[in-house]
């Protein structure tokens, strides 16, 4: 029974920890009878986004089933509060259509014929394939491709134990441009704003309702506002976040950097900047621009040169580019300057992920922090590495010595992460093949642009030898796999997660709650699939066992990394893996656990999270330990080096850590961009996006003075494309959905199941007095899609928008492919590379073990837009630039809702056009990539050199 008790000035509805072993509530389904139910409450971590919020699973002691999920108040980031996606985990684990047993293809790929198999058969098959590939020197043909990981470090460790360069991710369709902008400044590839303590907050996002870490961030944004902070939002769309802002700046897509640099100009011209911080903590002395060389010059001379450089970015110029009023730009700039070191901001996807050069707004945004001295400060902008904690396991393999050009091709030497969206095109060009391919939390056929090119690659057994989809549910990509391997949801597996949610370092512990429940009842559990539904396994145990299958006798040197640190020569267990970490790698945890007479592992199983430290401000000023200074040299610029590598910097007379950049300072001037053939962008700059109005005009052959083909690829329309030209925003999120992971959460799709095209009333008139509900046809560079219009003043004129999450589909009516959210479609290849899709029926009620499937009242599954987009790789960051120049017209009589057409021949031509913008490696020293840039599963330094 829920207890409400007063704690200070707040009411608490969460059971106290001391009652988690036997919590009693009345059964709501038995009402009005008072039937008591006894629950074991077990903490875990949500995985319906990357926030890693804490959950409490209520396990019914009588039935042994999970009854519900609520927030964990002991979690430092989410603090007991979760969004709609947290409680929806109950829908996912009880989904009647989920995959419960390992399945093997028995017909042609994509044919939909499957037979149940065993985990042993899976391990033997893949173990033999991978062993042979490694022994024959074909390790680069083994690839692990993950969407959102939900773990820290364990897969990098596994792949490096195998000695391969085989880690691929979805980051370059997610956040690579933002990461690139942050890396250039301070090496850390993500921001960590201290919203709660800020005086002014600037969001280039809809971050109160959606996006990366939005639940813990939204809490702290509101904390900041309650304490008096003002909020500004730059977004072309009137989101719920924008509606809460003190200043809404509906900028035209791709012009954000112009607005931010105009703000920087105001702060510079009015001398409102923190000169001491800039002089001490930027590499201004290395700057060379516009004929100015800082070496030997004064800091004041540098500032005057900087003012001259940014003189063109007047508020009036920014207004002309963006549509944001000049007076609002000036007012916001002065608010930022007044906030000083307590200015916080956030830009992660949005404009960064949508636009060519989307990393430039990040460079400009951090410039505002540098001008105000709000880097690493209370209420300011911090580095993710300062607020994230990744403990090391008992034994770490050496880095691999090979470089996989399917992951990091030489055309994009500065790309932030793997060029994953190009994989079908790279393989089509004959650059390689895949012998063993694992996809995990990864559905590129649906989530990626150009999904039909993925189908063409995945169905070809000469290109992809063996494909396993590690997934809890059927999805569009799994349909083209050889094996579908059921992996657990949030509450069905082990993981460690830590995220930069606020001014703190913490870890969260995901655990399979039914396994923990049965072990508490005294049952011996060897593998997690023994307590999960069906034979649903978990990745940690799968990779341990697969590694033993690859190297059964240890002769390859792989097995040693998966042997117990406590029982030499024996296979490690998950308890041993995490137990060792908690005992040895988490500062303070053993002592905290000891106070409760618990082992560190038992403590984490009890509470689910642990706060490591809140001492996270100004870590650049942290003194270097005396032991680290042995054998070091101080360079003329103050950088402290050891064996030729920077480890710190002199701060006046103190040896301190600094930032992890070549200068050990914030790099206002990027010598890296100069050295790697992009000198024009050495300072934070603005250049026009591929969706700029000039690009629209050029696509029609009209005069376009601002169109620069050196940076902006020309849009070539398919011959049947008609209609008015717009910029399409295809990536805004809905608060209740997340990519395709939430597709089987029935209550989330009851809330949101339609993605109409947002059209401003001014534009609706141009399209022939378009009304809400009218069918429109949206033409892209490679095809079209048909959907309903929604006429709203909540979108900037000249811009249309469509939410990312919806439009799931299945090719057979009875396929168990998330029938709450998918339409049954007729999919045909009508010519070489020419694909047509037509919806036969939308969502319908159906019979299953869940009576709610008969109560489905909605019929709309939305329309799949991503599959009609070509790849747009940014020439520097490698990010897929999501925004599209499109043509919109009223649908024709033969068009139907949900119709899709794509020509993959055109998509490959667009890929080649964008590839031509790149400036390939090698860089200085015959390098493939700057050695100081971060890289997941980083190889040894020697692998960075092109082999002669």
Positions of PLM-derived features:
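Glycine-rich phosphate/diphosphate-binding loops that line cofactor/substrate pockets in enzymes
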Residues: 122-141, 191-200, 309, 330-345, ...
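Extended redox/cofactor-interaction regions of prokaryotic respiratory oxidoreductases
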Residues: 155-223, 227-232, 258, 366-483, ...
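Long, well-ordered, tryptophan-enriched scaffold segments
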Residues: 228, 232, 237-340
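Long, C-terminal catalytic modules of enzymes
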Residues: 512-610, 831-862
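Short beta-strand-centered aromatic/proline hotspots
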Residues: 787-791
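Short, solvent-exposed secondary-structure boundary/capping segments
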Residues: 793-806
């Amino acid at each position: 029974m829920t207890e409400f008790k007063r704690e200070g000035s707040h009411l608490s509805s969460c059971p106290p920890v001391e009652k988690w072993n036997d919590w009693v509530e009345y059964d709501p389904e038995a009402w009005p009878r008072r039937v008591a139910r006894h629950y074991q409450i077990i903490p875990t971590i949500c995985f319906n986004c990357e926030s890693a919020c804490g959950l409490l699973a209520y396990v019914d002691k009588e039935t042994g089933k999970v009854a519900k999920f609520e927030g964990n108040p002991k979690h430092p980031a989410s603090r007991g509060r979760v969004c709609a996606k947290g409680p929806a985990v109950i829908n996912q684990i009880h989904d009647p259509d989920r995959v419960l047993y390992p399945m093997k293809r028995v017909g042609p790929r994509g044919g939909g014929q499957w037979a149940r198999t065993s985990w042993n058969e899976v391990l033997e098959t893949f173990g033999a394939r991978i062993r042979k590939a490694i022994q024959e020197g074909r390790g680069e043909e083994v690839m692990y491709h993950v969407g959102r990981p939900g773990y820290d470090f364990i897969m990098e460790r596994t792949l490096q134990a195998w000695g391969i360069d085989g880690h691929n991710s979805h980051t370059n369709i997610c956040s690579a441009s933002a990461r690139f902008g942050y890396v250039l400044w301070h090496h850390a590839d993500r921001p960590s704003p201290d919203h709660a303590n800020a005086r002014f907050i600037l969001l280039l996002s809809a971050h109160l309702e959606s996006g990366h870490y939005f639940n813990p961030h939204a809490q702290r944004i509101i904390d900041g506002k309650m304490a008096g902070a003002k909020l500004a939002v730059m977004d072309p769309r009137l989101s719920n976040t924008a509606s809460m802002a003190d200043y809404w700046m509906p900028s035209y897509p791709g012009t954000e950097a112009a607005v931010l640099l105009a703000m920087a100009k105001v702060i510079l011209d009015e001398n409102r900047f923190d000169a001491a911080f800039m002089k001490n903590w930027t590499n201004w002395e290395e700057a060379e621009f516009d004929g100015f060389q800082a070496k030997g010059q004064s800091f004041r001379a540098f500032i005057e040169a900087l003012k001259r450089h940014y003189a063109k970015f007047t508020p009036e110029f920014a207004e002309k580019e963006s549509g944001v009023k000049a007076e609002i730009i000036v007012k916001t700039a002065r608010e930022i300057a007044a906030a000083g070191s307590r200015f916080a901001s956030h830009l992660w996807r949005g404009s960064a992920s949508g636009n060519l050069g989307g990393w430039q707004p990040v460079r400009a945004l951090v410039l505002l922090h540098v001008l105000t001295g709000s880097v690493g400060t209370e209420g300011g902008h911090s580095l993710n590495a300062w607020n994230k904690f990744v403990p090391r396991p008992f034994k770490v393999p050496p880095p691999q010595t090979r470089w996989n050009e399917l992951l990091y091709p030489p055309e994009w030497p500065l790309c932030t992460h793997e060029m994953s969206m190009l994989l079908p095109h790279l393989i089509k060009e004959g650059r390689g093949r895949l012998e063993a391919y694992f996809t995990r939390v990864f559905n590129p056929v649906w989530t990626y642009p150009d999904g039909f090119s993925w189908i063409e690659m995945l169905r070809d057994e000469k290109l992809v030898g063996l494909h396993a989809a590690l997934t809890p549910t059927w999805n569009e990509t799994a349909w083209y796999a050889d094996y579908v391997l059921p992996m657990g949801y949030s509450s069905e597996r082990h993981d460690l997660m830590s995220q930069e949610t606020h001014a703190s370092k913490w870890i969260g512990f995901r655990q399979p709650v039914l396994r923990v429940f049965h072990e508490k009842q005294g049952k011996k559990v060897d593998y997690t699939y023994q307590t999960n539904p069906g034979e649903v396994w978990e990745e940690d145990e799968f990779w341990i066992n697969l590694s033993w299958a690859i190297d059964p006798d240890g002769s390859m040197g792989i097995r040693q990394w998966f042997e117990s640190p406590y029982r030499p020569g024996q296979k490690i267990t998950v308890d041993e893996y995490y137990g060792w970490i908690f005992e040895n790698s988490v500062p303070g945890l053993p002592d905290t656990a000891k106070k409760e007479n618990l082992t560190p592992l038992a403590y984490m199983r009890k509470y689910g999270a642990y706060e490591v430290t809140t001492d996270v401000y100004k870590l650049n000023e942290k003194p270097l330990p005396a032991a680290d200074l042995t054998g070091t040299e101080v360079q003329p610029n103050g950088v402290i080096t050891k064996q030729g590598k920077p480890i710190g910097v002199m701060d006046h007379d103190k040896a301190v850590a600094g930032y992890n950049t070549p200068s050990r300072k914030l790099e206002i001037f990027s010598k890296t961009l100069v050295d790697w053939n992009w000198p024009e962008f050495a300072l934070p700059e603005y250049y026009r996006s591929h969706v700029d109005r000039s690009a629209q005009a050029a696509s029609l052959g009209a005069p376009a003075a601002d169109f620069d083909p050196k940076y902006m690829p020309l849009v070539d329309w398919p011959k049947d494309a008609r209609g008015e030209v717009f910029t399409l925003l295809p990536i805004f999120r809905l608060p209740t959905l997340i990519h395709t992971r939430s597709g089987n959460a029935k209550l989330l799709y009851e809330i949101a199941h339609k993605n109409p095209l947002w059209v401003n009333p001014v534009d609706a008139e141009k399209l022939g007095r378009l009304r809400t509900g009218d069918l429109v046809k949206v033409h892209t560079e490679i095809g079209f899609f048909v959907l309903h219009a929604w006429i709203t003043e909540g979108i900037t004129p000249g811009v249309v928008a469509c939410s990312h999450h919806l439009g799931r589909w299945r090719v057979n009516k009875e396929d168990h492919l998330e029938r709450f959210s998918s339409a049954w479609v007729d999919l045909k290849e009508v010519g070489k590379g020419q694909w047509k899709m037509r919806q036969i029926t939308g969502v319908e009620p159906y019979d299953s073990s869940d009576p709610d499937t008969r109560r489905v009242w909605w019929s709309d599954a939305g329309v799949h837009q991503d599959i009609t987009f070509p790849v747009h790789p940014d020439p520097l960051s490698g990010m897929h630039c999501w925004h599209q120049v499109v043509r919109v017209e009223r649908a024709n009589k033969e068009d139907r809702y949900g119709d899709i057409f794509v020509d993959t021949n055109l998509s490959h031509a667009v890929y080649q056009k964008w590839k031509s913008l790149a400036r390939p490696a090698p860089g200085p020293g015959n390098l493939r990539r700057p050695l100081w840039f971060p890289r997941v599963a980083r190889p040894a330094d020697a692998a960075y050199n092109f082999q002669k």
